[in-house]
């Protein structure tokens, strides 16, 4: 949600943002609703003052033993008028809020303008793309040859794009999680294992719900959704709270399974474990002072890069364009890892600064002194690891000529010093 004052006083900034994002949004209706809403606030405040004044008059009359019947009639009329206005005000407030919750976030000036991923900007590359002197396989063939994944039985049990991890791939998956949590613990993150379901109010605080409903699973007959990422649960964790300024930044590392419909996956992604309905993920989430959020954004990206460098996985960093980034983010970096079996870089990380957009929706504020005015803080999020995608990268990039998989050195201690699968 954007600052209503900004929408009212500088609507051209909002129009420019909508144009850059190529989003069709009825800003004029929102502005009109805001104006009507403000007029109702003035009218209801005036009537409440009038009602209070009449109540005092009645009290004075009764104290003096005088007849207050005419004033009581006046009070009744005022109360009826106020009740009617409050109903109308609630209606316009609901209309305004519903619209305001769907407007996208502002866009940072460094974000490239463009319709889609073709306008994304490559920021850097790291690592050498592996060169093989033998015919390589993709992760689907590798996992089948080594009995590491069972897709056929998973499809029988749960449907397409589910999987059974098996044998040493289970251990490698757990090694990635354990290493990732240890890695972030050393970077001043507090570890969080959130609820795997959230209610609609929490979801609407973190995302534009109508957009995200197509992605996540709804629990039938319950006000609950399976989480698509722990980001949403961590964002809502501090909803309606005032945080002490001295405690900022708050850095959380959330570990959880994630559940997504992943509609629209095509080609080879329909097979294997790269794009699936369920996966384990470690997510970074930060509550920051507004003046520090861009520094925190770069810090988060640097930490995530360091993690993949330690895994020896070649990657590139992309700055997403206005047409490719999410509506909640003001600026997003993606990290794409090299997948040797596909001869391509594929997305593994999304790292975003959401400014005060989520904090306004979730009513999360901070202050430095007890009697000081509160401010909305900034929220940031970044994937550290979605394990199935990194399992794909490791299987393809670390395959050997005798059909095995070399285990990255930093993970070997987590697998009893095992060096290959």
Indicate residue ranges for each PLM-predicted region:
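TRNA-recognition modules of translation machinery and tRNA-sensing kinases, especially anticodon-binding
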Residues: 125-421
């Amino acid at each position: 949600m954007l600052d209503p004052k900004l929408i009212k006083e500088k609507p051209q900034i909002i129009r420019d943002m909508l144009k850059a994002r190529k989003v069709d949004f009825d800003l004029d209706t929102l502005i009109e609703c805001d104006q009507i809403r403000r007029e109702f606030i003035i009218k209801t405040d005036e009537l409440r003052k009038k009602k209070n004044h009449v109540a005092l008059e009645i009290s004075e009359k009764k104290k003096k033993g005088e007849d207050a019947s005419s004033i009581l009639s006046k009070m009744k009329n005022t109360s009826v008028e106020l009740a009617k206005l409050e109903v109308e005000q609630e209606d316009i407030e609901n209309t305004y809020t519903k619209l305001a919750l769907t407007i996208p976030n502002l866009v940072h000036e460094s974000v490239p303008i463009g319709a889609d991923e073709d306008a994304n900007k490559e920021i850097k590359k790291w690592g050498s793309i592996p060169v093989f002197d033998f015919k390589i396989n993709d992760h689907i063939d590798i996992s089948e040859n080594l009995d590491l994944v069972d897709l056929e039985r998973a499809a029988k049990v749960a449907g397409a794009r589910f999987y059974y991890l098996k044998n040493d791939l289970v251990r490698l998956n757990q090694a990635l999680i354990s290493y990732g949590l240890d890695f972030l613990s050393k970077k001043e993150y507090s570890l969080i294992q959130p609820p795997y379901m959230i209610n609609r109010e929490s979801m609407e605080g973190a995302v534009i719900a109508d957009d995200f409903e197509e992605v996540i699973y709804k629990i039938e007959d319950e006000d609950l959704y399976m989480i698509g990422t722990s980001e949403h649960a961590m964002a809502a964790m501090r909803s309606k709270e005032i945080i002490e300024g001295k405690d900022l930044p708050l850095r959380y590392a959330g570990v959880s399974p994630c559940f997504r419909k992943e509609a629209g996956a095509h080609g080879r992604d329909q097979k294997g474990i790269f794009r699936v309905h369920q996966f384990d993920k470690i997510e970074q989430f930060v509550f920051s002072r507004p003046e520090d959020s861009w520094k925190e954004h770069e810090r988060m990206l640097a930490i995530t890069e360091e993690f993949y460098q330690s895994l020896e996985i070649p990657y590139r960093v992309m700055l997403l364009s206005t047409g490719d980034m999410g509506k909640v983010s003001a600026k997003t970096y993606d990290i794409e890892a090299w997948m040797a079996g596909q001869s391509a870089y594929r997305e593994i990380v999304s790292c975003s600064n959401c400014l005060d957009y989520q904090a306004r929706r979730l009513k999360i504020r901070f202050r430095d002194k007890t009697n000081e005015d509160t401010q909305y803080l900034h929220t940031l999020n970044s994937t550290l690891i979605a394990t199935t995608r990194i399992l794909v990268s490791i299987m393809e990039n670390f395959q050997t000529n005798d059909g095995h998989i070399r285990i990255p050195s930093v993970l070997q201690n987590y697998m009893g010093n095992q060096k290959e699968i």
